[in-house]
């Protein structure tokens, strides 16, 4: 059955059957089933031998809803929407209402909120301050470090560069997320290591067993392009003469460790997980290509699902368990370019990776968390009919009579222009004259700048497995790392004892609540 046939079938199923099936009995029956499931659910309080964290970069609640509809209609569910526990995370930074990915990843993976665009350091490090970032008292250790400290194997896979903003706080400490390689660092930062070097030279990076993603230009000096992988002009290029991929290899040889290095689909398929303990997969000079135009042949790049499955096959050999972080990073990239169709497809592929994972694990002993780092400026609006194409036209404006799409952006780049000049007047462009379902179509935006910007809204967190019920309310984003540490009994020193009280005594907690109450009263 073709995709078009499936979409048409779903559309007519909804239209024809809605009158007869979706009556009062239908909705009350659904509610009864959900209630029974909730009442019969039992909390899992086993120790989490394994932890898997999925991060959909820029995956806002509207992105999730739109992707659900895009995939299979309004009543369908993405992989994580079957998880029993859900919470809300506040994403603001210490110094910004709307965050970036490096600061939010530091909160998610290190349990400490910090300044905009810094990596793995606390708020005592201003953006770009190399000297401050060298103070180890300001370093924020991550869940990767905690897992390694208790003997677990660790890994991460991403569709972005392995040195990019979201994965970097797993292993690096930097005053600027842009310092991925030495050419991106100013003269005043020469005393600091670039992020790529920290991945290869320092702990915990050098002991991460599985690393997969893009970013060859950051790892290898004077990297060259190919037919399937041209030079990424958006990314920096290493030029210090070093080949960190080769240095990673030499480190593993010197420690007599079994390893493999792969750079395309056919090489990844040949990996024998039984014989390999360390795997480095760098599949692109910059980010891995968007799924809609990714080369799938032998010399092409693997999907997020394929990388995730390969990572699990290696990590699951560990008798003491593992921690794996998986980032669907191109959801964010698509949104920044104002291409909603690309963002929705990347979200569906993110769901595919989670579906594949759930078939390989036992949730009695594995905690799975799915969340996002921040929202985006895409909005889902208008009054389109049930069963409409989510990428199509919603209706005509009652003011200017011109149609508008169901998905739009509040901010966007030059390609997201909503108005054109006609007879010395500004006139809104009619999107119905274009193919709004195309992957290259740019939805209209209200404010035009260099690109579509992040949103400052809350994100959702979904969980299943040991202690998943600890996600139950509105939480600070930094709470996620604490739950992981508690569920896996990793006991990082920063949190004190394992009772959940950590360093906060009753008097301190009372004082914090009192101060909050006082400030709220004064502001009224």
Language-model features: where?
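Cleavable N-terminal signal peptides of Sec/SRP-targeted secreted and luminal proteins
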Residues: 1-18, 508-522
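A post-motif C-terminal structural segment
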Residues: 20-33, 44-49, 59-65, 69-110, ...
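Active-site-adjacent structural elements in enzyme catalytic domains
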Residues: 47-72, 135-151
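Structural beta-sheet core signal
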Residues: 53-54, 156, 370
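His/Cys-centered metal/cofactor-coordination and adjacent catalytic loops
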Residues: 120-137
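Glycine-rich phosphate/pyrophosphate-binding loops
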Residues: 139-145, 149-169, 492-495
């Amino acid at each position: 059955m073709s995709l078009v046939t499936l979409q048409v079938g779903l559309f007519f199923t909804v239209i024809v059957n809605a009158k007869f099936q979706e009556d009062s009995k239908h909705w009350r029956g659904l509610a009864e089933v959900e209630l029974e499931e909730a009442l019969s659910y039992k909390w899992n309080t086993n120790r989490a031998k394994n932890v898997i964290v999925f991060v959909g970069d820029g995956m806002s609640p509207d992105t999730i809803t739109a992707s659900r509809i895009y995939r299979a209609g309004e009543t369908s569910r993405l992989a994580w929407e079957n998880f029993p526990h859900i919470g809300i995370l506040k994403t603001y930074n210490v110094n910004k209402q709307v965050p970036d990915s490096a600061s939010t990843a530091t909160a998610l993976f290190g349990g400490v909120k910090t300044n905009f665009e810094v990596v793995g350091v606390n708020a005592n490090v201003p953006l770009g301050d190399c000297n401050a970032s060298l103070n180890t008292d300001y370093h924020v250790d991550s869940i990767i470090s905690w897992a390694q400290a208790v003997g677990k194997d660790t890994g991460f896979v991403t569709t972005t560069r392995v040195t990019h903003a979201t994965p970097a706080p797993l292993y690096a400490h930097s005053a600027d997320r842009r310092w991925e390689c030495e050419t991106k660092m100013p003269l005043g930062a020469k005393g600091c290591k670039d992020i790529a070097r920290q991945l290869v030279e320092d702990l915990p990076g050098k002991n991460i067993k599985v690393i997969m993603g893009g970013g060859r230009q950051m790892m290898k000096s004077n990297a060259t392009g190919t037919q399937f992988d041209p030079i990424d002009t958006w990314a920096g290029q290493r030029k210090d003469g070093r080949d960190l991929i080769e240095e990673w290899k030499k480190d593993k040889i010197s420690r007599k460790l079994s390893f493999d290095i792969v750079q395309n689909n056919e090489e990844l398929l040949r990996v024998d997980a039984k014989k390999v303990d360390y795997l480095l997969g760098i599949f692109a000079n910059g980010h891995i290509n968007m799924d809609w135009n990714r080369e799938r042949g032998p010399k092409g790049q693997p999907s997020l699902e394929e990388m995730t499955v390969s990572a699990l096959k290696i990590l699951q050999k560990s008798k003491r368990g593992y921690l794996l972080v998986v980032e669907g990073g191109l959801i964010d990239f698509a949104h920044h370019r104002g291409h909603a169709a690309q963002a929705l497809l990347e979200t569906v592929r993110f769901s595919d990776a989670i579906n594949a994972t759930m078939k390989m694990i036992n949730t009695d002993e594995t905690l799975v968390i799915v969340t996002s780092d921040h929202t985006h400026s895409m909005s889902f609006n208008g009054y389109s009919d049930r069963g409409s194409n989510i990428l199509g036209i919603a209706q005509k404006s009652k003011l200017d009579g011109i149609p508008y799409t169901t998905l739009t952006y509040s901010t966007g780049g030059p390609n997201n222009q909503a108005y054109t000049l006609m007879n010395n007047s500004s006139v809104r462009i009619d999107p119905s004259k274009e193919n709004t379902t195309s992957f290259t179509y740019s939805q209209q935006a209200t404010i035009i700048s260099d690109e579509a910007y992040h949103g400052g809204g809350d994100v959702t967190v979904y969980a299943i497995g040991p202690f998943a019920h600890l996600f139950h309310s509105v939480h600070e984003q930094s709470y996620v790392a604490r739950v992981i540490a508690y569920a896996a009994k990793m006991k990082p020193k920063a949190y004190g004892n394992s009772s959940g009280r950590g360093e906060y005594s009753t008097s301190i907690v009372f004082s914090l609540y009192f101060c909050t109450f006082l400030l709220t009263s004064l502001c009224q």
